[in-house]
């Protein structure tokens, strides 16, 4: 299937996959990664994307394996006037397992004198598979439709189900509601509700939270 000229970076391989998509029927699967910088890369045409000028860039990413959150980068690799390879950040986004998140910068200036340009997507420090969809370059200032950003809490505290940074009776009430409902809509609440870290949220977690609050 057509990967739209995207290629694997480093040890990574790429292929189209119908497992998930942001738009259409398929997305680009990036797999076989052995380091965080192993990702997907695509050459930029210097006639379409002129060094020294501004452009809008966007790409949507998602993943299913690994940690609850992951940090993704959209970057530009290029050769400068001295012949040295440089790496410049276009956009950063923190993603959540099973969700789509958008890497976007409406006004990115391609460094003047850049040659052999490639845009690429990588992670901060993980090696799990991930997916890319709707990677687009456009006129500067263009707001490219996409998944948008995800509001990720700075810290996740076991038992802090309402994510306000404090464990109190409101969290116990939320835990009881979650137990009655069979779970939580918020993935972060679901994560911290598993107080005993059994990988399953159940009555034992509610009891442990209740006991903690009674101390």
State where each predicted segment sits.
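Extracellular glycan-recognition surfaces and repeat-rich motifs
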Residues: 1-29
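Short, surface-exposed beta-strand/strand-loop-strand elements in extracellular ectodomains
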Residues: 73-79
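Extracellular carbohydrate recognition and processing domains
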Residues: 82-114
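Surface-exposed loops/turns
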Residues: 51-52, 97, 112, 197
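Cellulosome-associated attachment modules in secreted, modular CAZymes
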Residues: 147-215
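Extracellular carbohydrate recognition
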Residues: 122-140
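Extracellular recognition modules
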Residues: 58, 118-122, 210
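Extra-cytoplasmic beta-strand recognition segments
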Residues: 1, 28, 38-73, 103-110, ...
């Amino acid at each position: 299937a057509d990967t739209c000229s995207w290629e694997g970076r480093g040890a990574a391989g790429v292929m189209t996959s119908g497992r998930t998509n942001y738009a259409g029927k398929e997305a680009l699967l990036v797999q076989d990664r052995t380091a965080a910088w192993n990702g997907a890369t695509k050459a930029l045409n210097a006639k379409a994307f002129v060094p020294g000028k501004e452009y809008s860039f966007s790409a949507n990413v998602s993943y299913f394996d690994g940690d609850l959150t992951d940090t993704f980068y959209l970057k530009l690799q290029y050769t400068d006037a001295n012949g040295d390879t440089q790496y410049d950040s276009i956009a950063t986004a923190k993603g959540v397992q099973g969700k789509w998140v958008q890497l976007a910068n409406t006004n990115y200036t391609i460094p003047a004198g850049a040659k052999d340009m490639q845009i690429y997507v990588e992670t901060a420090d993980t090696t799990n598979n991930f997916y890319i969809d709707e990677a687009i370059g456009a006129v500067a200032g263009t707001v490219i439709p996409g998944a948008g950003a995800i509001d990720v809490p700075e810290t996740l505290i076991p038992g802090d189900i309402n994510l306000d940074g404090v464990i109190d009776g409101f969290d116990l009430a939320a835990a009881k509601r979650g137990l009655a409902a069979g779970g939580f809509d918020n993935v972060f609440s679901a994560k911290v509700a598993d107080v005993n870290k059994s990988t399953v949220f159940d009555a034992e977690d509610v009891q442990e939270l209740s006991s903690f609050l009674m101390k």
